[in-house]
C-alpha cells in the first residue's frame, strides 16, 4: 500500500466517523420531546415550526369527554396564539404548563 492510498483511506475513515457522530447527535435530539421544551425554546423556534409543535403538545394524550374532537384549523385559530402569548410572558416555564393551565380553565 502506498502513501497516497493510505491517505485516501484515512480521509475516508475520517468522513465516515464524522457522519456517524452527526447521525448519533441527530438521534439523541430526536428523542427529546416538547415535554422538555421551555417556553423560551418554543419562542426561538422557526415560526413555521411553532404551529405543529404547539398542536402536538395540545393534543398529545388529550381525551375529551364524550369523544369530542377539534380540527387542526380550529385549534390553530384559537389556541396557537394563546400558547405564543403565554410563552412570551413566561419564557422560563415549561411549554406543557400552558396545557395544564388550559385544561384547568376548560370544562370537561
From Swiss-Prot:
The modification N6-acetyllysine is found at residue 93. In vitro, HdeA is more efficient than HdeB at pH 2 and HdeB is more efficient than HdeA at pH 3. In vivo, both are required for optimal protection against acid stress at either pH 3 or pH 2. It is found in: Periplasm. This is Acid stress chaperone HdeB. Homodimer at neutral pH. Dissociates into monomers at acidic pH. The keyword Ligase does not apply. Keywords: Acetylation, Chaperone, Periplasm, Signal. One of its GO terms (molecular function) is unfolded protein binding. One of its GO terms (cellular component) is outer membrane-bounded periplasmic space. GO terms for biological process: cellular stress response to acidic pH; response to acidic pH. HAMAP family: HdeB.
Amino acid at each position: 500500500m502506498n502513501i497516497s492510498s493510505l491517505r485516501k483511506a484515512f480521509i475516508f475513515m475520517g468522513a465516515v466517523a464524522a457522519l456517524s457522530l452527526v447521525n448519533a447527535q441527530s438521534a439523541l435530539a430526536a428523542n427529546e420531546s416538547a415535554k422538555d421544551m421551555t417556553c423560551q425554546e418554543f419562542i426561538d423556534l422557526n415560526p413555521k415550526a411553532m404551529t405543529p409543535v404547539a398542536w402536538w403538545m395540545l393534543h398529545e394524550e388529550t381525551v375529551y369527554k364524550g369523544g369530542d374532537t377539534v380540527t387542526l384549523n380550529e385549534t390553530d385559530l384559537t389556541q396557537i396564539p394563546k400558547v405564543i402569548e403565554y410563552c412570551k410572558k413566561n419564557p422560563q416555564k415549561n411549554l406543557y404548563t400552558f396545557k395544564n393551565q388550559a385544561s384547568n380553565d376548560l370544562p370537561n
